[in-house]
Every structure is written in structure tokens, then in C-alpha cells.
């Protein structure tokens, strides 16, 4: 079975998100330029969203309860270690991947379940929310880097045409 095209878009988006923070020092990752969050908080926040949408809603599991508390929507901005949140992000995305690989258009059209009850969103809506959310925070992270005086920043959107070109789902 071929991977769903939205999963290809997510994989590309994840790579671009991580490309945007490549080379950032531990010191710069925790700096806050108000009202923005720190770059490291943004990484933890996307780890939270992937864990919630793809592990909790998709598979009924949570790898990092602390991530679920510290980086949830509306949680206060903090300055966590970049190493800590990147490790959690890698673990969470790795755990999500097998489930994502099996997604079909039919599954994407079904409502997600939390605590035994359907929620308002389909798995497809949640997948799109994650993709778009990544791009929002990729832009925010680039703005943080510009404000910190970083130069030679990556240009976006990378190699989309080769890495994640449009293709129909069937």
C-alpha cells in the first residue's frame, strides 16, 4: 500500500521544521524575544501536538506525560533545553510513524476518539492541523533567529518538488 500523500507532506514539513533550527546553539534556543516563545519551546510544542494527535488520539498512548503538560496549547512559555525537547520530538515522531504509514483516506475521514468518545475532528483534519502548525512555528523560529542576528538562514520551501510533490491519493 502506498503511503497517503498527506503523510508525505507531513514528513517533508517535519524535515523543513528541523532544518530551520539546524545549527542553533543551546544558548540561543532558550532565549525569548517577547511576545514569542523560545525556539526550544516551539519544538516541545510540536512534540506535544504530534503526541496528542497521533499517539493519544491515534493509538491511545502517551510517551511523555511531561510534554503533554508543559507544552500544551495555552501552556506558559518556558525555556526548556533544546536537547531535551529534540529527543522527545524524535521519540514521539518515531512512535507515530508506523501508525501514520498505515493511514488511508477512509481512516482520515473518521472522527478521532478521546477517552472513549468521538471528538469533533477527523484524523484528516488533525493531520492537516499538524502540517500547518509546523509551518507557523517554522516561520516563528526563523523570525527568532533573525532577531538573534543569525545569518545565512535556510530558504523555504526546500526541495518540495522532488521530496514531496503533489500526487493523488489513489
Regions found by a protein language model. Name each.
Residues 22-29, 105-108:
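Short, flexible helix-adjacent loops and helix caps
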Residues 1-6, 75-77:
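Short, charged, low-complexity loops and linkers
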Residues 74-114, 121-136:
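Acidic/histidine-rich alpha-helical segments that form the ligand environment
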Residues 7-11, 18, 26-72, 114-170:
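Short, contiguous alpha-helical
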Residues 8-12, 103-106:
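An acidic intrinsically disordered interaction segment
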Residues 10, 14, 21, 89, ...:
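Hydrophobic alpha-helical core bundles mediating ligand binding, dimerization, or RNAP-core interactions
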